[in-house]
Amino acid sequence: MKDYYSENGFEEIFEEKGSTSSNISDNCASRDYDVNISSDNPRLLDSYRPKGNYGRDRNSPLSRHIGVPNQEIILQGLTPEILEEHIELALYATGAKVSTVTLIREKETQKSRCFAFAKFVSLQDSKDWMEANFPTLVIDGIDVSVRFSRAAREQIEGWCCQNCDILNYSYRESCFKCRVPRNQASIAIGNHKISKRNGDMDVSDVPSVYLILRNLDRSLSEETLWKGLSKLEIDVQRVFMIRYKFNDAFCGYAILEFKDVDESAKALMKARTYPGKGFTLASRKVSVDYIHDGVLIPAYTESARWQFPTKTGYLVYWDPELYCSIYVPEGIDTDQFKPIEVNKKPKKEKRARSSNYIDVPASKKVATSLQRWNDAQKELKDNIPDLSEEEEKLLLHFVWKSALICVLCERKFQSWGHVVKHITQSIMHNNNLKNHELVSSAELLMHRVRQTESVDYRDRATERRIVPAASSDTIVEAKKSSQGSSFHSTSNVSMKMLNSMGWNKGSGLGTNENGIKEAIQPTMYLPGVGLGNKGSKIQINMTPVDRVKDRARSLYFQNDKNNNL
């Protein structure tokens, strides 16, 4: 097995293919390359770049560079008509364990750019396949150049200064610009991508309990930062210093937590109006601002090492590569930061729904009037306590039943259910029962109410219509006539019309005299009864005794009818 990753390995490959370093140089000259390649300097094979489209030339020396081993390989020199399926079949035929194949196309025309990428299942699979098939693969009778993709390059040697974000050579022990030692302000370049993280993306103008301090010296510690904040004379609850997870290096900005928004606003005003050159820490002017809501986010899947508690739950910093190093000043109670546990109320058993409620399918929108009707029914029917006779006499002592008024509290209600709720659950009613002055005045008023309700009803309107000189017998007859129907009165306009049409008393209406024989009695709805309810209508002129008789008569005929059936 040849070692393709050494310089001798390249020379052996070129000799097998009938090429030498000299004719490679001639080939490069004929193709107008920038670099002159000679046998004395074979290392230039890895660094030269052609001026033209190198991906289309499968015979160029660049295509014979195997590259840095990784899971992806690049296939160059494909025909424009080839598809991903053809590439997959060719790779599977050679025993390649490929997971995905991506053919690169033009964005506008979607035409093939004649090169593709193939990703293997593992790094070892790609190495084994390249050792067996490098440098070409035959697809549809055409030799296609294969090598490792350039995505995985060798790690850059060097380190980045955390204090000034300047790249330094690996042999430097201190930053050449700010002279900070390497062990205090360095990040190894390689697996971690270096980007400027200075807190500029966390700034907001919306007031909150958090303030962000930017442009801090990256060599500061928690104690040093806290001592510098003491000159502002502010009440800080916690200090969050933003650090990298992989080496705990300070990023140069921190977040302060206050008790409420008023405290943070005072601290912001003090920092921005600080006398002299402004608010400084370690001889550096510090920028102070609010943070937005997306800086500290809920910790759903984050490790417990990086999250911190608050009253609303556990939070983490939004950047996955950074975390908050917490410093709590002396004298601050840490129990106040624990999340508040919410006790879940046990689910109550569902009560049987009343037949008065109107069921509506969940998929349809409930009309406003229908929803209002259901809510009113629930309010009247639900949670009304049952009272015994003794309790009712005691509790309803100050209730004007006919008017639905609590005389003691001087409150009028819309339904009997509201009255019962008031006398059993109202705190005001219980307090008024202990007030002797209110109780005595309510007793007097209820005495008058009972006297008024005990007097028989007099139809004073009918009495005023009667001639003053009439006898008592005439008054009684007029009273009876007012309670009865006015259908039989001869002075009635309707009666005169019927008589002129030939109608006789006792016969039915209509040509065949098969219509109604009795007058239609005027009726009204009982108060508090819903529309359509059976027995909701009563005659206007009927007394309570007549109503009981009419009800008994209807029940008798109904039972008699059922027995006959």
From Swiss-Prot:
Q: Which organism is it from?
A: Schizosaccharomyces pombe (strain 972 / ATCC 24843) (Fission yeast)
ZnF (C2H2-type) residues = 404-429
InterPro entries, per the entry: G_patch_dom, Nucleotide-bd_a/b_plait_sf, RBD_domain_sf, RRM_dom, Znf_RanBP2
- Keyword Transmembrane helix among record annotations: no
Q: Where are the zinc fingers (RanBP2-type)?
A: 153-184
Q: Name one GO cellular component term.
A: nucleus
Ranges where the G-patch domain occurs: 490-536
- PROSITE patterns from the UniProt entry: G_PATCH, RRM, ZF_RANBP2_1, ZF_RANBP2_2
Q: Which GO terms describe its biological process?
A: mRNA splicing, via spliceosome; regulation of heterochromatin formation; regulation of mRNA cis splicing, via spliceosome
* Signal peptide, first to last residue: none
Q: Is Kinase one of the keywords UniProt gives this record?
A: no
GO MF annotations for this entry?
Answer: RNA binding; zinc ion binding
Q: What is this protein called?
A: Uncharacterized RNA-binding protein C57A7.13
Q: Which residues form the RRM domain?
A: 71-151, 209-293
The alphabetical list of record keywords is: Metal-binding, Nucleus, Repeat, RNA-binding, Zinc, Zinc-finger
Localization recorded for this chain is: Nucleus
